């Protein structure tokens, strides 16, 4: 899953840069949204991992 969120961030960065270079504000905005979505997924995944690690420690 972490790879998916990183890929989404990279894809967003490419779109944002392309939109900026081509002066395409819609593409640039779409890229920003993809980056933000990917980052949010990454943060959620990290939080889930930490909770699961904590639960595993409690079970021991």
UniProtKB/Swiss-Prot annotation:
Annotated InterPro entries: CsbD (IPR008462), YjbJ_sf (IPR036629)
Protein name: UPF0337 protein SSP1897
Organism: Staphylococcus saprophyticus subsp. saprophyticus (strain ATCC 15305 / DSM 20229 / NCIMB 8711 / NCTC 7292 / S-41)
A Pfam family this chain is assigned to: CsbD
Chain segments carrying region Disordered: 1-60
Superkingdom of the organism of origin: Bacteria
Gene3D superfamilies: YjbJ (1.10.1470.10)
Biased composition (Basic and acidic residues): 23-60
Similarity section: Belongs to the UPF0337 (CsbD) family.
Database matches in SUPFAM superfamilies: Hypothetical protein YjbJ
